């Protein structure tokens, strides 16, 4: 018996406003509430959603619901699964509430499973080692699906099927039982994707997308140059029947059915006839991802190191669709570096805008790959060229960064900003003397204080005489007061333990002072909230 697991990814990004700069100049004074309309091209976004709904979403939902109803009283039911991004649902709420209702009808059928995923279709799983932002976005998505469909997802998929061992550990730590990723040869070697595996050193079940059979439907279906064209449901079902193993995972973009392949291609008829053609084969059964994970014990482990992260994108099937060329890398790193600052503001509007800019689509448009992958990148790019995509994104990200910094300059946030952890490249590296690094680099005042306790006094003397500590505190950390205090200490010409002791006392006093300010702000904020509720 072979399970057939059919899954759909449903996503539309908020595309950026190419005229952002001119629109900004025309408006003059801009408030935070104006930024969502300024940063994104909602006329274009609405147009794309409405067009895709007409050609794809409504017809496909209708077909799937009809086929579920057709087989729901039979032994071999038709079942599917959806991964729907949070930003897609937001667009439905804005411009197509009827479409959202049709997804709710599917949820009520009892034959549809919903997967969790990062709310903003982001690359947050690649941000640092603790993956705090990744976890927060999945939790936001989980709450959305629960509220909207009264459904508790048990299986999670990452954006574009990005996967490695560390990501899997995070998913397991959140309580998920299974995930899905690409069945890449370099991790499978001689093994087949048509089995259930588990993550390395984990109990998380891993379902692997059969990309050959998935892409027959998702990419090659309407290609008249393909030797198997035209593809009908009967032929495709026979290919599924010939596949050995526990399960065949078919995972495609939902836009396959009417948007990527237009209705004239026969894709809707293919979808309509597929359940029945599969059910003609006695050993084929439709299953949801959680059913597959429960039915089959894993036959082995999938081992994917972080340096070998996989995805379902392009021929490389790695993160290079988004992080490859200098334009993509600069934007990705700049976006990541804003996390501490934007969250330090505590401003929900700014945090939400920063998260919208995390949508992987923005970096995808900057790809300069050639060949087949390049054609796909160009097809989806609303900016016309990778350079234009880079220019528009950079302008908007820079504008957001400037507004975040202005927010952080407010007195109540200044202390929090000084205590923040600095991004890579902004830390202080201790040297013993010129060209003799100690190997110690700190990224916050508290790390600086802790390192001063143990670093050799020759390093402290080297930096205090050159004014390095003061410059870093003033120009990078932004603590002018502390910088001035260290300048005064350097004038005293202290040496050895006496110098270390004076620096530590000054640092300890300043850190306590800053923490007291932030704690006082927190107390006042809580007090104001209590007043509002009484």
What do the PLM-derived regions correspond to, one by one?
Residues 52-60, 127-138, 217, 225-232, ...:
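Phosphate/oxyanion-binding active-site loops and adjacent basic polyanion-contact surfaces
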Residues 63, 94-107, 188-201, 231-239:
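Alpha-helical scaffolding within the catalytic cores
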Residues 3-8, 13-128, 154-157, 177-182, ...:
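Short, well-structured secondary-structure segments
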Residues 136-193, 256-273:
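Catalytic domains of cell-wall/extracellular-matrix polysaccharide-remodeling enzymes
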Residues 2-55, 87, 194-204, 208-211, ...:
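Active-site and substrate-binding clefts of carbohydrate-active enzymes
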Residues 76, 80-160, 202-221, 245, ...:
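Metal-dependent polysaccharide deacetylase catalytic core of the NodB/CE4 family, i.e.
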Residues 61-65, 100-104, 135-145, 168, ...:
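Generic structural signal for well-ordered alpha-helices
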Residues 404-534:
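Terminal, compositionally biased segments used for targeting/anchoring and flexible tails
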